[in-house]
C-alpha cells in the first residue's frame, strides 16, 4: 500500500495538472494533500485524482472561503471520517479518517500552523494528546508539521525546544518517525526558505506501534521538473506499507 503526502502550495494553481500527473506516476493508493483549497484548480485536481483511481475523497477545504488552505484525502478504498474531542480544533488543518483497505488503518493528516498568532503550540499539544490515546488499530499520521529536531532537521538554527520536544514526546509515546526509522541521522530537507535558501525537514510521517511492522520503504521526492522547477515548494513523502 503506497501513501503519498504532499504540500502542494496555495491550492496548486496553474501547477495543478502537473501535480496530478506526478501523483499518477507515483501510483499511490492513498494521497493526502496540504494547502488544498476550495478553488477551481484544486477542484480539478480532485477530479483528476478520481480519474486516477482515487475516487473516495474527503476534504476540509471550505468553498465559502476558497483562499483558505485545507486538506484533501483521496483513496482507492472507502473512507470513514473520525472525529475525536481531543483532536486539534482547527477544522481546515486536521483530517482523520479510517481507510477501509484490505488491511485497514486510520490516517491522520495535519498542516500545523506557524508560530504567528499563537496557534501552533495548542495544535501540537492536541496532536500529542490524540497520539497518546489508546489506539486499537494501526494509525499513520502525516503532514507538514512546521517542526523538526534541533541540529538534525535544519541547515541553520530554526527549531526551538518546544518543537524539538514535541518530536521527542511522540517518539516516547510509541510513534515512529518513518524517515528516521529507516535512515537514522541522514540529512534530508523538504522545504527551503525563499530568502536564505536554507533547508528544513518539516514534512513527516509517524506510525504507531501497531503499524510500524508494516513499514517497508520511505522516501522524499521532489517529482519531475519538466520546466526546471518542481511542482511545489515542498518535497512529497512516499511511504510503502505491507498490504
Predicted segment positions?
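Short proline/glycine-enriched turn/loop segments at secondary-structure junctions
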Residues: 192-195, 225-231
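Metal-dependent phosphoesterases centered on the DNase I-like endonuclease/exonuclease/phosphatase
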Residues: 47, 52, 123-209
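Acidic/histidine-rich helix-loop elements
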Residues: 3-14, 116
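Low-complexity, intrinsically disordered Gly/Pro/Thr-rich segments
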Residues: 54, 214-228
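Active-site beta-strand/loop signature of hydrolases that rely on acidic residues for catalysis
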Residues: 2-8, 19-42, 107, 127-154, ...
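Structured beta-strand-rich core segments of catalytic domains in phosphoester-bond hydrolases
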Residues: 30, 35-115
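Conserved beta strand-loop-helix elements of the APE1-like EEP
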Residues: 66-81, 99, 195-214, 241-242
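Short catalytic/ligand-binding loop motif for oxyanion handling, primarily in non-cytosolic enzymes
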Residues: 12, 40-42, 66-67, 116-117, ...
Amino acid at each position: 500500500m503506497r501513501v503519498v503526502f504532499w504540500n502542494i502550495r496555495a491550492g496548486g494553481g496553474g501547477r495543478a495538472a502537473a501535480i496530478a500527473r506526478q501523483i499518477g506516476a507515483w501510483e499511490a493508493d492513498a494521497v493526502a494533500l496540504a494547502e488544498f483549497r476550495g478553488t477551481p484548480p484544486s477542484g480539478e485536481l480532485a477530479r483528476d485524482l478520481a480519474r486516477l483511481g482515487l475516487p473516495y475523497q474527503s476534504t476540509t477545504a471550505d468553498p465559502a472561503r476558497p483562499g483558505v488552505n485545507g486538506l484533501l484525502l483521496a483513496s482507492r478504498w472507502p473512507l470513514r471520517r473520525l472525529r475525536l474531542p481531543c483532536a486539534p480544533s482547527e477544522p481546515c488543518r486536521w483530517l482523520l479518517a479510517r481507510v477501509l483497505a484490505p488491511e485497514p488503518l486510520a490516517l491522520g493528516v495535519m498542516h500545523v500552523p506557524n508560530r504567528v498568532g499563537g496557534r501552533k503550540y495548542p495544535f501540537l499539544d492536541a496532536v500529542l494528546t490524540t497520539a497518546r490515546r489508546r489506539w486499537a488499530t494501526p494509525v499513520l499520521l502525516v503532514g507538514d508539521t512546521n517542526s523538526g529536531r534541533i541540529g538534525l532537521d535544519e541547515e541553520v538554527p530554526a527549531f526551538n525546544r518546544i518543537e524539538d520536544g514535541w518530536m521527542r514526546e511522540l517518539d516516547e509515546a510509541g510513534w515512529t518517525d518513518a524517515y528516521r526509522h529507516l535512515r537514522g541521522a541522514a540529512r534530508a530537507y523538504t522545504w527551503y526558505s525563499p530568502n536564505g535558501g536554507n533547508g528544513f525537514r518539516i514534512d513527516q510521517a509517524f506510525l504507531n506501534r501497531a503499524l510500524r511492522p508494516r513499514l517497508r520503504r520511505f522516501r522524499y521526492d521532489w517529482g519531475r521538473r519538466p520546466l526546471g522547477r518542481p511542482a511545489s515548494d515542498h518535497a512529497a513523502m512516499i511511504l510503502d506499507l505491507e498490504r
